[in-house]
Regions:
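Structural preference for beta-strand elements that scaffold enzyme active sites
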Residues: 20-24, 42-44, 66-72, 105-108, ...
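Active-site-adjacent beta->alpha loops and helix N-cap segments on the catalytic face
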Residues: 10-16, 34, 48-65, 117-128, ...
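Glycine/small-residue-rich loop that forms an oxyanion/phosphate-binding "nest" at active or ligand-binding sites
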Residues: 13-48
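Single conserved hydrophobic/aromatic residue that forms the stacking wall/gate
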Residues: 1-12
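Residue-level signal for inorganic ion chemistry
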Residues: 6, 37, 71, 109, ...
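Acidic (Asp/Glu)-rich catalytic clusters
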Residues: 14-18, 38-39, 57-66, 95-105
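Active-site loop/helix belt of alpha/beta enzymes
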Residues: 75-184
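Helix N-cap/beta->alpha junction signal
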Residues: 6, 30, 48-50, 86, ...
Length: 184
């Protein structure tokens, strides 16, 4: 607490942020926003379509860098969730994605379970995602040394996700509390 102030500023960007921050993008990413994050992002968790993958490839090529990404897999019983189906993920990876997208490194999979109290449903969805992860990692369609992340589990279901092999969890609500949206 700096004398009660909540808003702080600095004129020098390099002094505001540590140089070793690794920025992960975890939400739904619109194609028109890719150009704003590709120059600095460490990992995009939510690549949910080939169209988005193509835009990331194009923007990463312009920056002369390789962007690490996770393919979002739609395993939930909710239409509001995004992502590749299990089969469309297999097709993408078997189709030579590393040659088609040289500025993108597929580092794993991400998925969100159905928002429910039914733990059996959540277990089935996490189990299906883990099975796909193991299948892909064991295939020749990815670089198995880079393909090591399985991002699943949020504040309400992360213990189940960890039991199913999750390497990354999204637990902002547990840390910061429910998000409050305000009207201006």
């Amino acid at each position: 607490d700096v004398l009660g102030s909540r808003g702080l500023g600095d004129v020098y960007k390099r002094q505001v942020l540590p140089k070793d921050i690794e920025w992960h993008f975890i939400g739904h990413l619109q194609t028109n926003k890719v150009k704003y994050i590709v120059p600095f992002i460490t990992l995009i968790h939510s690549v949910d379509s080939e169209k988005l993958l193509s835009v990331i490839e194009s923007e990463a090529a312009k920056c002369g860098r390789v962007v690490d990404c996770l393919l979002e897999i739609h395993v939930a019983q909710e239409d509001s969730k995004y992502g590749f189906t299990l089969d469309s993920c297999r097709e993408l990876l078997q189709g030579g994605s590393s040659e088609k997208y040289p500025h993108v490194r597929i580092c794993g999979l991400m998925g969100m379970a159905t928002q429910t109290d039914d733990e059996d449903c959540i277990e089935r969805e996490f189990s299906a995602l883990k099975k796909l992860f193991d299948e892909v990692k064991g295939s020749s369609s990815v670089d198995s040394s880079a393909f090591c992340e399985l991002s699943m589990g949020m504040s309400h279901d992360y213990p189940l996700a960890l039991r199913h092999g999750s390497t990354l969890v999204r637990i902002g609500t547990s840390i910061f509390g429910e998000r409050v949206y305000s009207c201006f």
